[in-house]
Amino acid sequence: MTQSWNNTSEQENFVLSLLGNKKGGHYVELGAFHSKNGSNTNRLENEFDWKGVSFEIKEDLRKEFNENRSNPCMGDALDFNYISYFEDNSFPKQIDYLQVDIDAGYKKNGRPDGSAYTSLHGLLAVPLNSYRFTVITFEHDANMYWRNDVMRDVQREILDSLGYSLVVRTESEDWWVDPKVIGLEEYRKYFRWDHL
């Protein structure tokens, strides 16, 4: 039976389902936005006792997040020493979940408000050669702006070359698993390839 997953909070359901409602996991969230509304990690932290670190460049959202959540929300995901943070906070080498969704939104004319490649830069900032992630969700918004097709494709090349398996592919997001941790028989029931 194929599962149907939407975006935003459904990412948490996808992660929890693949990991058997794991308690005490670890996450890294690039692009936190609000602490609860549209959050991809609120349930992980508050219902399943996950430890994690989030990033939000907008100061008002970061302040709101830090006032309402226990796990910290930092500023710039592109200028952060991930390895030191992970070591200082006892993150495992196999982190359960990486969420990448850092963009500044879109103007009325459909152009990005800032770089079209911020999420890709965020992915490249994470030490992918030193740490692995069991589940990765990457928002590329290829449906929003034509240049995002390039970002989507480069992200796919990077994660595929690192041995990750693409499980969910929509017009705006890609969801990946580490097949060294989650076997094909487990993740194949979640396959969803809506778009290139």
Where do the language-model regions lie?
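Secondary-structure boundary motif
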Residues: 20-21, 46, 67, 88, ...
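Conserved acidic-Pro-Pro-aromatic motif
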Residues: 43, 50-51, 93-100, 104-196
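SAM cofactor-binding core of SAM-dependent methyltransferases
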Residues: 2-84
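Conserved amphipathic alpha-helix within the SDR
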Residues: 84-91
